Amino acid sequence: MRITKPITLYRDLSYFHSLLKSCIHGEISSSPITIFRDLLRSSLTPNHFTMSIFLQATTTSFNSFKLQVEQVQTHLTKSGLDRFVYVKTSLLNLYLKKGCVTSAQMLFDEMPERDTVVWNALICGYSRNGYECDAWKLFIVMLQQGFSPSATTLVNLLPFCGQCGFVSQGRSVHGVAAKSGLELDSQVKNALISFYSKCAELGSAEVLFREMKDKSTVSWNTMIGAYSQSGLQEEAITVFKNMFEKNVEISPVTIINLLSAHVSHEPLHCLVVKCGMVNDISVVTSLVCAYSRCGCLVSAERLYASAKQDSIVGLTSIVSCYAEKGDMDIAVVYFSKTRQLCMKIDAVALVGILHGCKKSSHIDIGMSLHGYAIKSGLCTKTLVVNGLITMYSKFDDVETVLFLFEQLQETPLISWNSVISGCVQSGRASTAFEVFHQMMLTGGLLPDAITIASLLAGCSQLCCLNLGKELHGYTLRNNFENENFVCTALIDMYAKCGNEVQAESVFKSIKAPCTATWNSMISGYSLSGLQHRALSCYLEMREKGLKPDEITFLGVLSACNHGGFVDEGKICFRAMIKEFGISPTLQHYALMVGLLGRACLFTEALYLIWKMDIKPDSAVWGALLSACIIHRELEVGEYVARKMFMLDYKNGGLYVLMSNLYATEAMWDDVVRVRNMMKDNGYDGYLGVSQI
């Protein structure tokens, strides 16, 4: 009978080296710490090569903790293996990988000898851990001591120069790369292209790109990204076409860069499907954001629903888009979904949702969002507080606006501007000027163009021409007259203060007036009783090729209303709908109904109200009732009054109008009846009292 001896596996250092190398490449699931402990339990003694491989394996492992790293360093010290520079370099890399920057710095300082590798390792580690300034300082010292940087070092330094706009420092890195021959390295060249594009040096980026002989996918993506960041859509598309023609592999980054350049998303979506990227969450998220930006919310929702993984960026994009459209009910549904998925909304996303709270009916939603900001800690962010200030301003809640402002630890100019603008929007211009004086007393801050525009709007409210002129002088001294929105505010201020000559002068001084500026001039003429000039201004605007918006037509219809230009009003109203595709608001309908009513065209006015796409409010019916009083049209007036009572029976002005209508026909019994009804509902009929 033959006896077979059991085979024993001979485990020498090479066996453990092989296991550790497998850890580096991710070929086995065992922890490097576990393998190293097995080695120590055997009779084998690790050498400096063992420690170098072990430290590299530990660097790539996600299961290492700071305590274990310190234990490894203790073992190195006891065994004397820490005298080898490359072993200490591996340990330094391990510290940096785990975010122990201070420990890495101490280890570097203790090293009696340093080679190029350890210098590069610490510089790259600083950069990866957010210590870019320290990385730059160390880079300077390294060059002074005669050591040469690696390609990885330069690649890690250039993003810092680009983000901070340090053009001269970035060019210095380029110079070092050229002298050392590292400029030929594709990674360095890509980093240089990205740096120059971030610093608005596209010419230099283009030269580097053209010089590249072997352009990889990363190189093409970098150039497309450079054009995208600069808003050059056509150039980004041209580079992509060249990339496509040369059969270069398209990556998810290619698609993301093109979408950020606002390239048409539908063809790119088709390309994503063809290239099999439909499961890439970053690509799907970018497409969702692109569809949301264009207002294609149905497509955005479907695409988001088809994704295998939820994305906070995609979801907040949909929420913000609905909020921007004013569909707060749907926005709240999606916002609730983020809470159910335990996603944390950031400050930018929350402010986007807050901007959607525009109507008084949104106050409960706005206060709930305020509560979320407090619970999540976002209320400490200046950006969020400014968003809340803007929101409460829309609700005319100036007290809360001032309270929020007082809670700010730091008050940058943007916060002062938010409060000043909020007070003006709420009809509290005097409070806005008090806040402005407080800002000037604090010192250190000077008003900018936005401050001046808000204060000019306050002057318009108060009809304070002298103060408006002082602000105009400040505008000229500080070259703010080049800002269209400041000039628009100046025109509005002069027009509302009755100085249409000066308003015209400001308007004529503008080289290229925008639509808002034309709107301000049209409204100014209308307010000043110059209705013919308002219509001429509108026609001139159209001749210049500018597209009127809904504000333009408010000014034009107001001019037609006050001037009694019925035919012109009808033409403009039709043009607004059919030619420019603008849906009339309640204000447009109120002006048009008032125009028809004043012209005794009551049948047309009623027909217009009946075919409205939106429910008429008291302002629309009130415009017709006022016309009935003027023309003593009792039958239509009573019909309109019944409609208004159904909408708001507590409206004291309605009782006064009905009383006046009956008085024009000497129907005194009805006057008494309406007056009694008014008193029964708590109104005395006095809308104002004079002390004279």
Curated annotation (Swiss-Prot):
**Where are the stretches annotated Type E motif?**
620-692
Repeat in keyword set? yes
Q: What Gene Ontology terms describe what this protein does at the molecular function level? A: RNA binding
Kindly give the InterPro entries that the UniProt entry links to this protein. Answer: E_motif, Pentatricopeptide_rpt, PPR_At4g14850-like_plant, TPR-like_helical_dom_sf
Alphabetized UniProt keyword annotations:
Repeat
What the record says about family reads:
Belongs to the PPR family. PCMP-E subfamily.
| The protein's name in its UniProt record | Pentatricopeptide repeat-containing protein At2g04860
Lineage, broadest ranks = Eukaryota, Viridiplantae, Streptophyta, Embryophyta, Tracheophyta
Name the gene for this chain: PCMP-E74
